[in-house]
Design a protein with these regions (language model features):
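Short amphipathic alpha-helical heptad-repeat segments
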Residues: 2-11
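Exposed alpha-helical structural elements
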Residues: 6, 22-25, 80-84, 88, ...
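Charged, low-complexity interaction regions
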Residues: 13-23
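Buried, small/hydrophobic-residue-enriched core segments of structured protein domains
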Residues: 27-73, 110, 122-136, 140, ...
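Gly/Ser/Thr/Ala-enriched C-terminal appendages of enzymes
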Residues: 32-87, 91, 243-244, 248-254, ...
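N-terminal, Lys/Arg-enriched amphipathic/low-complexity engagement segments
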Residues: 63-130
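Short glycine-rich, low-complexity/disordered patches
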Residues: 118, 189, 525-529
Length: 529
């Protein structure tokens, strides 16, 4: 029976008996259920419940680590571990009721395994009885927001109770999910490099102004394109490590509750097709006028392709409504943002800008790039991914159109469709064990066959020994306990969790500060992935 159902049954019994004290005694369980709706014991791969039988007798400690083994991007932004620590591991992670529920699914012939000799509930009972349900685990990690080149250790995990050596890698399943916010934050940051590059090349703004404006260039449109609210929360917050624009409001809850920050992703009033088509094709211009009148100041966006984006730009925005648009305050932050939403993104934008420049005029900045009047801009939110953004900017560059005229909305390609665990080849592996008091290195080094039939060593080779992440002039490197100077080397991995207690929390502002794109990174910006 789940913890939630157990609580409900006990509350019903207490109410029937008029036993108020019994209800008060349930408060710890109620708080656990509210904080932890998922049973941690069930948050692992089925095969892991058998591992206690495979470890050699006398196994006292297992030391494992997380790394990106290399992938699409050369660096990763470490972000999101604090989410999983707070939501799954902190405090009382396992209760007696959790163990009972897990046994219902795993413990006997009617369970997952169809046998009663796989799941050993005494392993979990021991944690409840000996440690009060707190996990005897130590985790050290690089500070969140740190940009680390791939093929380096990002966190280590080991058990602190020799009777719980099996627990280290049992937690792999839930902790490895950190690949998701890391990869979203990394992708978002790579887009940011491209945006900064073109702002520096095509605008007249100084560095501080570019830093501010770029915050609003890539907007998260991804909520509807992900598989769950949890994905929207975690992935949406990862995007906000780099940018400020977002329609994924739920991401702010993570920032507030997990990262102790009042930072908010910024959104703007905007229409959708249900609004623009509500009066039919003939009434589209009326809805456009209404959009301008409802929000005469500030930013307002209007989807304009319900029937004909080119007519909308030439006859409506650039014709009958032109003077109303230009009557908006000329100060930044008061523009109408025209949104095409169909067709080839680059070719559509090329024609849209041609029409808008013709109807509204433009100025030419000191670098020779065209700039629309401050009252009107364009957003592209359809068909947007890192490659199409680079392609669009390259086209605008050729056409001498300044990057400041355009912002982007990126949906499923930001939070789901273009990323998975193998985007950066994330893995958690054991690297060191202690058996009967003796430390041993652990390593995997597969031999594989490539597409040409050649036998080669796999990129999946793991690291061995106890690990440290060391900062160098070129970034970071991982050293092992076999390397000379290991004991004296400064480890960038800091203790963040031990025995149920979070030892170090990062604020969202600290995370964003560490993830800032550095000037030296802009010397060569990759645009094709």
């Amino acid at each position: 029976m789940s913890l939630q159902r157990t609580i409900k049954r006990k509350i019903d019994q207490a109410i029937a008996a008029g036993d108020i004290l019994a209800i008060k005694n349930l408060l710890p369980l109620i708080n656990k259920a509210l904080d932890r709706p998922n049973n941690l014991i069930l948050c692992s791969d089925a095969y892991k419940y058998s591992h206690h039988k495979f470890y050699p007798e006398g196994t006292e400690m297992v030391h494992s680590y997380l790394e990106s083994r290399g992938g699409k991007f050369e660096t990763t932004v470490f972000y999101g571990l604090q989410i999983y620590l707070k939501e799954f591991l902190e405090g009382i992670a396992i209760t007696a009721e959790d163990v009972d529920e897990a046994y219902d699914y795993l413990g006997d012939e009617k369970g997952v395994f169809g046998r009663n000799d796989v799941f050993d509930r005494t392993k979990f009972d021991y944690i409840v009885e000996k440690h009060g349900g707190k996990l005897p685990i130590r985790i050290c990690a690089v500070p969140e927001g740190t940009v680390v080149n791939t093929k380096n250790v990002l966190f280590t995990i080991e058990n602190t109770d020799p009777n719980c050596a099996w627990l280290t890698n049992f937690l792999e399943t839930i902790l490895l999910q950190v690949w998701y916010p890391i990869t979203v934050a990394t992708l978002s940051r790579e887009v940011k490099k491209i945006v900064i590059k073109y702002f520096q090349k095509t605008t007249d703004y100084d560095a501080a102004t570019i830093d501010f404006l770029v915050q609003f260039v890539l907007n998260d449109f991804g909520f509807r394109g992900v598989s769950s609210v949890q994905s929207a929360r975690n992935g949406g917050s990862a995007h906000l490590v780099n940018f400020t624009g977002s329609d994924t409001t739920i991401a702010n809850v993570v920032i507030n509750d997990i990262y102790n920050s009042k930072f908010r992703g910024a959104g703007v009033p905007a229409t959708e097709h249900s609004i623009m088509t509500i009066k039919g094709e003939e009434g589209e211009i009326d809805m456009m006028r209404r959009t301008l009148l409802q929000f005469p100041t500030g930013i307002v966006a209007c989807v304009s392709d319900s029937f004909d984006i080119f007519r909308a730009c030439s006859q409506y925005w650039g014709g009958e409504l032109r003077d109303l648009i230009l009557s908006r305050p000329a100060e930044p932050g008061n523009q109408l943002v025209v949104r095409p939403d169909s067709g080839d993104p680059a070719m559509t934008l090329k024609e849209v800008f041609k029409i808008l420049f013709d109807k509204f005029g433009y100025t030419t900045n000191s670098k020779g790039y065209k700039v629309l009047p401050p009252q009107i801009r364009v957003i592209q939110g359809d068909g947007v991914n890192i490659n199409s953004i680079a392609k669009i900017y390259a086209m605008l560059d050729v056409l001498k159109i300044s990057a400041e005229n355009l912002v982007f909305g990126m949906g499923g390609k930001l939070l789901q469709a273009d990323i998975n665990r193998d985007t950066q080849n994330f893995a958690t592996k054991a690297s060191s064990v202690v058996i009967n008091g003796v430390e041993h290195d652990v390593v995997k080094s597969p031999t594989e066959i490539d597409e040409h039939g050649n036998f080669i060593k796999s990129f999946k080779k793991s690291k061995s020994g106890r690990l440290k992440l060391v900062k160098t002039k070129d970034g970071y490197t991982t050293i092992t306990s076999k390397d000379a100077g290991f004991d004296l080397a400064k480890d960038e991995l800091i203790p963040v969790f031990e025995n149920g207690v979070i030892l170090k929390e990062h604020t969202f502002e600290e995370v964003r500060e560490r993830a800032i794109v550095r000037v030296e990174e802009l010397v060569t910006v990759k645009e094709v992935y």
